[in-house]
């Protein structure tokens, strides 16, 4: 039994591992990297070998875990793709949007036909339902708390329990319960390490929410507009709920929330899959006057040039994409970045080389579609992350206490900080795989 790493190690993005056991090849996630160099966007697995993969396990719908699937389907992969029902629904939306953005940027990409071919291969699995996916190989999805439908993948084979956490959040959010803890002894743990630096300590939801409301209030006082670039699923709804609560309380009186890009369609998917969200959300929907997805304070732009948004006196704009890699958030950024009264609030992880990361790093000038813009607007970073922070990752690894621990999905320069701390606490070696490395697990 061995595992090979074709992406998503010592980097964030293009997650793609291949586990070989019992004469079978199982791929765990098949993503693309957002931002960065074109040659580093795809996993390093040879596409001409797509037909050699027996099945694929998809942990959640984000493009850095799913964006490569249509390329595999296009090149001969015919096996099953295992995912939760919400992941299947969201995946179709995000893959279609990625294809549209690529077309806009004149990149070679997959077609609608390739997406349809991919979706036909998806087999939905429920959480906590142990399923035989191959002879002698069992799969159980555990809740990961990352986004709607996201899962940890627990594989049982050859007498071993192997857990892939994928992206997980060990704290409750407005939408989701915290990640489940496995109820079986784990032999091999593959744990994400997005926030693996000792300084990566994230605020509580309560503190982040208050900071967001205060930042919005200050910008409105100086007659500015606020842009919050968000992922369509997860952060989009999280921020929407927070702002809507502050409007209802009277703290952000007169505020209008504009949602643009895929957020509206993502909201419909969330509402359709409401049984997978925290229990209080279905209860709110049952009370007709308190449906968070149909709030009177939330609007979509009515005109193509967004004039109605800019005419609104008190406006917050939630727009995709969350790292400013495409979508309408780019349009709003160009309009707002050049005035001091405006505010750009970054609320999620920003990948190295992404436009969002450049703003976080204090860039004085940015380039959008070959045009330069001076950065004069206030740039604010308020964490509403769907990931565990340094302490959350450390605590999870200690509690699981697996025989073998591998850190994946993290920034190369930060991972050693978490690695050393886990080794110190548990007194065992923690491995950090390299790209194209193959490791024996028995």
Residue ranges and their predicted role:
Residues 1-57, 62-66, 71-238, 244-251, ...:
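His/Asp/Glu-rich metal-coordinating catalytic cores
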Residues 20-22, 156-158, 179-183, 242-248, ...:
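Short, solvent-exposed amphipathic alpha-helical segments in soluble enzyme
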Residues 201, 205-209, 293-305, 323-325, ...:
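A general structural motif
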Residues 212-347, 351-352, 408:
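Hard-cation-handling environments
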Residues 338-374:
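Redox- and metal-dependent alpha/beta enzyme cores, enriched for Fe-S-associated oxidoreductases
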Residues 402-403:
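Proline-aspartate-enriched helix->loop->beta-strand connector
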Residues 414-439:
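Short acidic, glycine/proline-enriched helix-loop-strand junctions
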């Amino acid at each position: 039994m061995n595992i090979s790493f074709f992406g998503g190690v010592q980097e964030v993005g293009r997650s793609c591992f291949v586990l070989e056991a019992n004469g079978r090849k199982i791929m765990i996630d098949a993503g693309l990297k957002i931002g960065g160099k074109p040659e580093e966007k795809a996993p390093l697995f040879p596409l001409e070998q797509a037909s050699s993969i027996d099945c694929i396990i998809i942990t959640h719908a984000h493009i850095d875990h799913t964006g490569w699937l249509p390329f595999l389907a296009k090149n001969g992969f015919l096996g099953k793709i295992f995912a939760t029902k919400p992941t299947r629904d969201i995946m179709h939306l995000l893959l279609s949007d990625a294809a549209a953005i690529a077309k806009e940027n004149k990149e070679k990409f997959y077609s609608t036909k390739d997406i349809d071919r991919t979706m036909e291969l998806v087999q939905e699995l429920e959480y906590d339902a142990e399923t035989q996916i191959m002879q002698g190989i069992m799969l159980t999805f555990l809740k990961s708390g990352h986004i709607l439908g996201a899962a940890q993948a627990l594989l049982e084979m050859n007498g071993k329990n192997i857990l892939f956490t994928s992206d997980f959040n060990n704290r409750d959010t407005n939408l989701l319960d915290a990640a489940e803890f496995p109820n079986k002894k784990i032999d091999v743990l593959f744990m994400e390490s997005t926030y693996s630096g000792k300084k990566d300590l994230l605020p509580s939801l309560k503190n982040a929410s208050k900071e967001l409301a205060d930042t919005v209030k200050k910008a409105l006082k100086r007659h500015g507009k606020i842009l919050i670039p968000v992922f369509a699923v997860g952060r989009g709804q999280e921020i929407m709920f927070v702002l809507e609560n502050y409007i209802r309380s009277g703290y952000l009186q007169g505020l209008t929330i504009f949602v643009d890009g895929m957020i509206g369609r993502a909201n419909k998917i969330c509402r359709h899959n409401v049984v997978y969200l925290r229990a209080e959300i279905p209860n709110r929907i049952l009370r007709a006057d308190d449906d968070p997805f149909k709030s009177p304070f939330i609007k979509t732009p009515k005109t193509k040039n967004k004039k109605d948004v800019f005419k609104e006196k008190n406006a917050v704009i939630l727009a995709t994409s969350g790292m400013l890699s495409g979508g309408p958030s780019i349009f709003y950024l160009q309009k707002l970045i050049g005035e001091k009264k405006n505010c750009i609030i970054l609320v999620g992880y920003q990948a190295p080389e992404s436009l969002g990361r450049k703003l976080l790093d204090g860039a004085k000038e940015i380039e959008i579609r070959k045009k330069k813009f001076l950065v004069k607007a206030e740039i604010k970073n308020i964490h509403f992350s769907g990931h565990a922070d340094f302490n959350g990752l450390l605590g999870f690894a200690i509690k699981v206490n697996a025989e073998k621990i591998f850190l994946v999905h993290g920034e190369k320069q930060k991972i050693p900080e978490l690695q050393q701390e886990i080794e110190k606490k548990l007194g065992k070696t923690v491995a950090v795989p390299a790209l194209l490395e193959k490791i024996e697990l028995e």
